[in-house]
Amino acid sequence: MIDATPSHAVLREFFDNSSLTWGLMACGVAQLLKLFLELLVHRRWRPAVLIETGGMPSSHSALVTGTAACVGWTLGFDHPLFALAAMVAFVVMYDASGIRRAAGLTAERVNGLPESLWPDAPEKPLKESLGHSRLQVLVGSLMGPAVALPGLEFVGSPLHLLSGLGAGLG
């Protein structure tokens, strides 16, 4: 059956998706924490960490666990969509700490090969910071619900927030 919902209503629903919004907020907070840690630990201002992969904490883990927590909180933790969101979260976190990390370690070794073994090596070395340690994934996975659930419970949906600020979208 074809849905006759007007496109503006679909856009409104999309932008008012609390699970999506708060999952993305958790991801953003994790990325900002990377910048803060760069300043605190390495004593340097390097905004590039905001768009790089790897590092503490895992923003992908924060994204998927924050989203899954919102889905569970909204629909119930026995709902099939929560099960799906949780399984996707586990796959993403396994990938970050397993496969992507292994690829980064391999790149590190390849970059360390002597020039005599690899005479046609690219001028730019392979990217080594691809994945996360288990601790980085754990911290990200705890940050997700810690950011998303209070946002969902106390602030609500994005359009609800904007209408409360006087934007007239409610």
Describe the predicted segments one by one:
Residues 15-18, 136:
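N-terminal membrane topogenic signal
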Residues 1-4, 25, 142:
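The first (N-terminal) embedded transmembrane alpha-helix
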Residues 7-11, 22, 43:
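N-terminal targeting leaders of membrane proteins
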Residues 37-46:
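A glycine-rich beta-to-alpha transition motif near the start of alpha/beta enzyme domains, typified by
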Residues 28, 32, 47-170:
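Membrane-embedded catalytic cores of phosphoryl/pyrophosphoryl-handling enzymes
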Residues 11-16, 41-42, 76-77:
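Helix-boundary and loop/linker segments of multi-pass membrane transporters
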Residues 17-34:
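N-terminal signal-anchor transmembrane alpha helix
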Residues 1-15, 162-170:
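Short, strongly hydrophobic alpha-helical membrane anchors
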